[in-house]
Amino acid sequence: KKGGQTFDFVNYSLNAATPSEIEQRNRELAAHEAARQSLIRPSREVTIDAARLPLQLISFQDANTTAAEEYNRLAVLLMTTASEQPIKRVLVASAQHGEGRTSVALNLACALSLAQRRVLVAETDLQKPSFLDFLGLSAEVGLTDALAKGISAGSAVVRIQPFGFDVLPTREQVKHPAELLSSPSFGEMLALFDPDYDFILFDSSPLLAVADTSLLVRHADTTVLVIRSGKTTSGQISKAIAPLTPEKILGVVLNRADRIT
């Protein structure tokens, strides 16, 4: 849920459009789809069985549930905001571990991809990576390999089918993540990814746990804050959002799930 947020849906009518306008719109849609097909070069595609995924990944399993609809609403909010101001990189953050940040990031990616947006989810919680276990994947190359060893970042990207979004996982824990996230290589990697995606989501470390999340704030255009009801105090929330300016907070997801990762 996004407290205090309202959602404005834009309806397009073709009734008043001229044939040339309709043709132009069709060309634009075709160009967008061509870009979607040609720009992104994931190293491999993996088809996953949604029925075997954790229950938290509800958008993968049943798009008709109330929870999945909430992710669709969040996706609409993000897309609407991005149409009004330059937003591409989204920090998905929480005050502490166990609030559902990773599941929110992956569910949001699924909802955006189903809305025909090109999405990359980068696992930037380098001290406690969980993408591979969460999605049941294995990887020989990950985000930290690309940064520390000079390996092509694209070689670490995996396309998740049948949902159509990409993930950039981290294979193993990093003792000093700030060194990697503050390196010129990280900024250069993001700059390479920018043209290929409509949205890049950062699944970050908890804001209160480590200092390296503040480094990601510099690279992000906006933030989605995940709070687990009954777990995080108002004082912890205030401290967590201290590095963020109000205009850099898109909204808050109040997570009430019993099982959170």
Question: Which residues are covered by each model-predicted region?
Answer:
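Pre-Walker A (Motif I) flank of P-loop NTPase domains
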Residues: 86-90, 101
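Hydrophobic positions on the alpha1 helix immediately C-terminal to the Walker A/P-loop
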Residues: 104, 108
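Acidic-aromatic/histidine active-site loop/patch
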Residues: 1-77
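Conserved beta-strand/loop subsegment of P-loop NTPase cores
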Residues: 146, 168, 220-261
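Aromatic pocket-lining residues of Rossmann-like dinucleotide-binding sites
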Residues: 112
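P-loop/Walker-type NTP enzyme "switch/lid" segment
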Residues: 45-76, 80-83, 94-99, 117-198, ...
